[in-house]
Amino acid sequence: MAKTERRKKPRTLPAQIERAISAAEDKKALELVVLDLRKAAGFTDFFLICSGTNPRQIRAIADSVMDALAAQGAKPAHVEGYDRSEWILLDYFDFIVHIFAPETRLFYGLERLWGSAERIELAH
């Protein structure tokens, strides 16, 4: 019997999101996932969600994402949570980056709340 091969659908994400993903990965962000909200919400197209292990790493991930996108001329319209560093939100209109402490991510459960959105796993 022939073995059935599973193929992942190739991901096609906007270049700015790919850049944000790379910047987050450069700072060792954990559990990266993208939610495609185009069919589920009117206020943004995508969420990029990831975690850091401590406040310093969470800020470093946020700084890396902001620096990488600023190099391309993009600045967040809004930044929240930078000082506390339990949940930093970077709003780029078309997509929003959420950087969580693990326990905060579990508590708020964005992936669960937006369960109807297509989930794009980022295995690199």
Predicted regions and their residues:
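Glycine/charge-rich, flexible interdomain linkers and switch-proximal surface loops
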Residues: 31-43, 77-94
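A short alpha-helix capping/helix-coil boundary motif
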Residues: 1, 43-46
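Long, contiguous binding/interaction regions
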Residues: 1-34, 38-39, 53-60, 67, ...
